[in-house]
UniProtKB/Swiss-Prot annotation:
PANTHER family, per the entry: TRANSCRIPTIONAL REPRESSOR NRDR (PTHR30455:SF2)
Source organism superkingdom: Bacteria
NCBIfam families with a match to the protein in the record: transcriptional regulator NrdR
The keyword Zinc-finger belongs to this UniProt entry's keyword annotation: yes
Cofactor note: Binds 1 zinc ion.
Molecular function as annotated in GO: ATP binding; DNA binding; zinc ion binding
GO biological process: negative regulation of DNA-templated transcription
Protein's job: Negatively regulates transcription of bacterial ribonucleotide reductase nrd genes and operons by binding to NrdR-boxes.
Official protein name in the record: Transcriptional repressor NrdR
Length: 150
């Protein structure tokens, strides 16, 4: 690696995992000027693309996922740590699949399944928006399914 001070080559003095365990911290020394510097090495993750219902494609946005879950959990006794973990788990699962393109339907279904485990009311709220319930009968059917599964 080139020295940021003089452009000369450097050697690695020390390597260790960074505090987040997702990077490697390397202490380096320039062979030309002798100055020391630190670099961080991370795996470059290819972008995850969401394919919308109308065929449009957009980059995965964790904040959109989190906003939807937060809205469903509004005024419910669901700790923020649980919501964050839910979003982390869904994102990790999506990124671990071999597909770089994920239909929005898959994301919605995973959110509903996760919310079903966390809080029934949050699940029904999310489902009513996600599945675009048109009347009370659709709402009732979803509630009945939830009650049967418990």
């Amino acid at each position: 690696m080139k020295c940021p001070f003089c452009g000369g080559e450097s050697r690695v003095l020390e390597s260790r995992p960074a505090s987040d365990e997702e990077a490697v911290r390397r202490r380096r020394e320039c062979l030309a000027c002798g100055r020391r510097f630190t670099t961080m090495e991370r795996v470059e993750v290819p972008p995850l693309i969401v394919v919308k219902k109308d065929g449009r494609r957009e980059p995965f946005n964790r904040d959109k996922l989190l906003t939807g879950v937060l809205k469903a959990c509004e005024k419910r006794p669901v700790p923020m740590e649980v919501i964050e973990k839910l979003a982390d788990d869904i994102e990790r699962d999506l990124r671990s699949s071999l597909d770089r393109e994920v239909p929005s339907v898959v994301i919605g279904e995973r959110v509903m399944e996760a919310l079903r485990q966390v809080d029934g009311v949050a699940y029904v709220r999310f489902a009513s928006v996600y599945r675009e319930f048109k009347d009370l009968n659709e709402f009732r059917e979803q509630l009945e399914q939830l009650l049967k599964s418990r």
